[in-house]
Every structure is written in structure tokens, then in C-alpha cells.
Amino acid sequence: MQPSEMVMNPKQVFLSVLIFGVAGLLLFMYLQVWIEEQHTGRVEKRREQKVTSGWGPVKYLRPVPRIMSTEKIQEHITNQNPKFHMPEDVREKKENLLLNSERSTRLLTKTSHSQGGDQALSKSTGSPTEKLIEKRQGAKTVFNKFSNMNWPVDIHPLNKSLVKDNKWKKTEETQEKRRSFLQEFCKKYGGVSHHQSHLFHTVSRIYVEDKHKILYCEVPKAGCSNWKRILMVLNGLASSAYNISHNAVHYGKHLKKLDSFDLKGIYTRLNTYTKAVFVRDPMERLVSAFRDKFEHPNSYYHPVFGKAIIKKYRPNACEEALINGSGVKFKEFIHYLLDSHRPVGMDIHWEKVSKLCYPCLINYDFVGKFETLEEDANYFLQMIGAPKELKFPNFKDRHSSDERTNAQVVRQYLKDLTRTERQLIYDFYYLDYLMFNYTTPFL
């Protein structure tokens, strides 16, 4: 054969490459199918072995939604995998200093200390036992008691057996009028429904003093610092209310709050302890909060609230004010308060009492007022059997050289506001005005 005959023309080269390519592709597809069949066969064989040996995949507990009614809680427990142990009390708690959102609800449960978590988990993976059934029924009993709890909490007649002095007769009459007024208001406008899921937020501002069986709801700018001093003395944490510093009162964490207890503890205390709340004219309380937090140096309120308020409500603000947040004007503060799109959330110092203490849910046994604070507080102390030498302190906790915020001071702050702005402030706090029978002389 001549060398010239061995040379393939381009057409033959193309056909040869095409044939080899098709053949290679078919071979690859065949091998892939064969490998998959082999792998599937092994998997099926393993499954058969595991089924015959009684093995099954673990189904973990589904996460509990944040906001649940009591009925949903019970349904959730019932529908869990029966091979798993649901602890009697599992507790989920969230602390937040600011009331930035309208507060998500906390579902409280508490891990049992009688057995370790790993031990409980290992025991629960078998078939249900009588012990497990009993524990599950016990958990349901707690939730059933919670669901049957009357909302609002029942109001109880005050025990006046320890009040011997006739000088308190007028105070007693005033107290009965306040209680009756609040009770009638709540009957007419309360509208309570499905509040079980909000229980732990509802009681988050309530302090507990077990020795004298007191529940006190903290309302900032209504004598709360001195009330917490009194609770510390009653708890045996101090010998005198006059020797406790501001920082020890607010940052010492010496006092217990009601939301730190389990469901049974909360339920029992709400229905057996004397529940007290002290309130103040909403406009006076608002001005007092502004003076305290924005007219004096403050390492928290100026950078957190002041900067945001100045940035949004002050046109052409200077750089220094935007950096340090100092010098907020009352009118700017009011614009922030009334803004439905606030640049920073609410704070307990100017939050409504209706949202701090929930008077129509808790049904307080004692309603004190800042306007008659010393008289109301000392009558209350005598009524609960406090030591005779313990009197409510009347000193100003902070900025003692400043004049106390009263009606005359409030008028000076309101004079720069329009009538519409003053009306809007009233509208914002109208529930507090109505619940506690405050008039509106500043409009």
C-alpha cells in the first residue's frame, strides 16, 4: 500500500471520532446505572436489617412556638413523640431592659432537678412506663390549673385587723373608693381574653416579699426606689431604708420578681398575697422622667435615646449633639413619644401603667398614689404587719437639689406645646387617666 493511500480524508476522521464518542457515552451511561443499582441494593439491605432489628430514627421534639394559648400548650405536649420525656417544668425566659417591641410572650418551664438531662433522655427512649405517664399527667395538671386560673385575678378584702389607730379611717375610705373605682372600670372596659400565654410578661414588673406576703408592681417615677428600699428591709437585707444607695436598689438584684417562679409559684402568690401598685398623674410622671433622664448627665439615656431623638426631630442639629445625644428638648421628646415610628423603643420610665402592671388582669388589692405617697405607704405597712419602727422614707432619691415635679413645674414644660400636642399626650395615657381617676387640668 502506498503511503498516500494510508492518509484519511477529513470526512473519515470526523466519522471515526463521532463513532468512538457515541460508544464511549453509551459505556459511561451503562456503568453509571450499574453503580446506582449496586448502591441502592446495599441501602435497601441495610434498611431491611434495621427494620428487623427494631431500629427507628429518633424524632426530636418540635420547637415550641413563642406565643401559645394554654390549650395549644396542652396539645403540643400530647402530640410529642411518646418515646421522649417531656420535663415537668421547662423554662424559657427573656429579659429586656427596653420595651422596644410590644413584647413577645415568654413561655415558662423549668427543667427538673431530680434527674440529670442526659439520664432523663436515655430513659425516655424506651416504651412509655407508668412513671413516665405519671410525670406527663403531672405536667398536664400544672397546665390545667393554669388554664382554669381566673383572669382577672380575684380581688380580696383587705385585712385591716392590724390597723389599730383611728387616724387611718379617712385613708381606709379613700382606699376603698380607689379599689371600687378600678374594679368597676375593669368590669366595664377590661375585655380580658387569652391572657394565659402572656402570664410571664404580665407579672415581669412585680416584686415579691414572701415573709409578709406582698406583691408590689414597680411604676418608675412613682416612688419605686423607696418602695424597693422598704422591700429590702422587710426581706432582712438591710436594717434601714435610709442606708441603701441608689445603685444597690436598682442594680443589686437583691429582690425577687414574680416571673422568676414557676407556674404554681406564680399562681399561688397572685391569689394569696396582698397585691399593691402605686401610681402617679401621667403628665407629672412623664415630665419627671424627662427631667431625670435628659436634663442631667446620663451615660445610658443620652447615647441611646438622646442621639436618636435629636437625629430625627431636630433639623440642622450640630455635630456635637448628634455625637453625645445631650440637650434633648421637651418638645423633641414629645415628638418621639407620639411617633408611631419611633427611632428607638419605649422605656419603663414613661411607659403606661396599664402596660407595666396590667391593673385589669392582676386586680390589685391596694392602690396607692404618689400624691398621697407617704400616707398611703405607711398605712399599707401597718396593714401588712411591718415593724412599727419602719416608716416610708420621704427623701428624693436622685438630684435632691432639684424641685420636685409638681403641677406648677408641669405647666412650665407644657407651655411650649400646642393644644393639639397636649391633647395627644392625654390620648396616649388616657387609660391611666381613666383607671386611676385622674383629671386633666393641663389641657
Swiss-Prot record:
One of its GO terms (molecular function) is chondroitin 4-sulfotransferase activity. Pfam families: Sulfotransfer_2. Residues 108-132 are annotated as: Disordered. The keyword Secreted applies. The keyword Endoplasmic reticulum does not apply. Residues 108-128 have a biased composition (Polar residues). Glycans are attached at N159, N243, N324, N437. 3'-phosphoadenylyl sulfate binds at residues 220-226, 280-288. It is an enzyme of class 2 (transferase). It comes from the Eukaryota. Its EC number is 2.8.2.-. One of its GO terms (biological process) is sulfur compound metabolic process. Residues 1-12 are cytoplasmic. Highly expressed in trachea. Also expressed in fetal lung, adult pancreas, testis and salivary gland. Expressed at low level in pituitary gland, apex of the heart, adult lung, prostate and mammary gland. Weakly or not expressed in heart, liver and spinal cord. Residues 34-443 are lumenal. The chain crosses the membrane at residues 13-33. GO terms for cellular component: extracellular region; Golgi membrane; membrane. Keywords: Carbohydrate metabolism, Glycoprotein, Golgi apparatus, Membrane, Secreted, Signal-anchor, Transferase, Transmembrane, Transmembrane helix. PANTHER family: CARBOHYDRATE SULFOTRANSFERASE (PTHR12137), CARBOHYDRATE SULFOTRANSFERASE 9 (PTHR12137:SF6). Catalyzes the transfer of sulfate to position 4 of non-reducing N-acetylgalactosamine (GalNAc) residues in both N-glycans and O-glycans. Participates in biosynthesis of glycoprotein hormones lutropin and thyrotropin, by mediating sulfation of their carbohydrate structures. Has a higher activity toward carbonic anhydrase VI than toward lutropin. Only active against terminal GalNAcbeta1,GalNAcbeta. Isoform 2, but not isoform 1, is active toward chondroitin. Belongs to the sulfotransferase 2 family. This is Carbohydrate sulfotransferase 9. The gene is CHST9.
